[in-house]
Amino acid sequence: VTDLSEAPPETGVTPSATSGPALSEPGLSEPGQTEPGLAEPGRTGPGLAEPGRTGPGPGQPRTPSAAAGAAAGPAAAGPATLTAAYERCRQLNRQHGTSYYLATRLLPDWKRPHVHALYGFARYADEIVDDLGNGLSPGQRALALTDWGERFFGYLQGGRCGDPVLAAVVHTVRSFGIDQADFRAFLTSMAMDLTVTSYATYDDLLGYMEGSAAVIGTMMLPVLEPADPARARVPARQLGLAFQLTNFIRDVGEDLRRGRIYLPLADLDRFGVAPADLARPEPTPAVRELLAFECARARAHYQAALPGVELLAPSSRPCIRAALELYGGILDELERRDYQVLRGRVRLSRRRRAAIFARHLTAAARAARRERQVDVRLPGS
């Protein structure tokens, strides 16, 4: 099986010569061209569709409003800045979210950059909070996060955005009319990471995950084009919770090193686990029971998310199905390793990730061919 665990190279984005600030990925920009070992679902023409362009939703064409398209156009950021911002978000996704990034490769070209943008927003905020290599105090990180958030909401109100990440996020939010309240909730939860190191109960943890995970699902919905957005909200939120709880279980050791425990303290007490037990190289029987309990809880969230897949546009379903398998497979791997969470990060094998991708590729290509893209020209394009 071709190794697809690390997504094939996408080396940049370039403006389209015909439709304003379109996105294109070199190596994928000629008709019929694909990257090694990875066919592009339904790809037939040059370049990626520009931000603000959508394909038809279930049953009929659907595009962002003209007002949204105008707001998201060149007035928000120049073409060079915009394409560079989308490329930066793609790089963040590829570098830090390999399973998620692999699943996004099953989306149609025109949807993918917007998903990268939303991932980039979340990842960049996370890097501010975790202070990766900057040596800032918690107070300085709080100020940096507040400043970044204020600039983001300011850009949404108008003006030219030159931020290397936010230009793409602002463009995506305007193009699809994504609820700004979701971003406020997310930033509130990110700020909690600067002061809160543990959660007493699962309800307390859910209060944090509401902003850090559930709203990520609802942010994505407009891009994924559900037939019934209202019905799709609950499953989308459940999927966000499932993904994050999976990460919390897998990353127990990494979080401990940062002084955080995301597993509810009430659960530790229930199974007779002390925080220090989570740092033992060899998990105790009590730790194994605790982690098995948390895995079962995560699986319940995955089950609650499943009905939402069929509500999405057909071209979005293969991506989400693959993501469900990729993240759910981490729980399988944790169980197979007898909950050895401190001996390196638990990952699916390259062969298994490749097999999951290949299993959904045909459906992705078929759906992309059926959904004819509708071009929304931006003013001045």
Q: How should these model regions be labeled?
A:
Residues 2-15, 68-243, 249, 253-381:
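Catalytic cores of Mg2+-dependent Asp-rich isoprenoid enzymes
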Residues 21-61:
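Long, intrinsically disordered low-complexity tandem-repeat segments
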Residues 37, 64, 248:
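Alpha-helical and His/Cys-centered functional microenvironments
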